[in-house]
Amino acid sequence: SIFSNFFNMFFGEQTDNKEQKSKKNKEKVPIKGENIETEIDVSIEEAFYGLEKKISLRAQNGKMKTFTIKIPAGIRNGEKIRLIGQGKKGENGGKSGDLLIKINIKDDKKYALRGIDLYTDLKITPWEAALGTKVSVDTIGETIFLHIPQGIESGEKVKIPGKGYKDGQGGRGELIADVKIMIPKVPTKEEMEIFKKLNQVSTFNPRNNL
């Protein structure tokens, strides 16, 4: 009918205009850029003292961009450092995202980090274990002397308070030394004679208690 044609022509145009305006406004809404995540490895001592580290990442334009990251002393394994506004660019005037760098603290030949405690292997000789002794142990930043009690066994742990990793409150965790009794792989003739003599005179048998 004439009325329905008029209605569709008038109100239909209004509806189309509203949809177009809505779409146009939506396109102009600022959208924040996405974050970029990456990770880097640092040593236990680097994390303990803190450092500046450079990393290079490929930017959106395809070029490499270098960032200087300040890693605070005592950072925890798995923590993330945030560089604000260094992520992907936003749209329609939106802010850029952030760059998040996860810190992986890697164990090394000296130490293994577990929480705020440092673990290290303490290798001693059978006679040191039998007689007791004093041995030097490297900790972060210093060397200390550790008393080994007479009769200590392989697998026992000696704990040194305050010589571990930073606890974030001005203190430190423990340094835990895992005792490993080592024998000479190629004993000298004299050592072999002593071992044979010990075998003859000793009544000790660790298997008696099994």
Positions of PLM-derived features:
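Post-J-domain flank of DnaJ/Hsp40 co-chaperones
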Residues: 1-60, 91-95, 199-210
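Intrinsically disordered, low-complexity linker/assembly segments
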Residues: 66-210
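Glycine-centered tight beta-turn/hairpin loop motif at sheet-sheet or coil-to-beta transitions
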Residues: 35, 60-64, 139-141
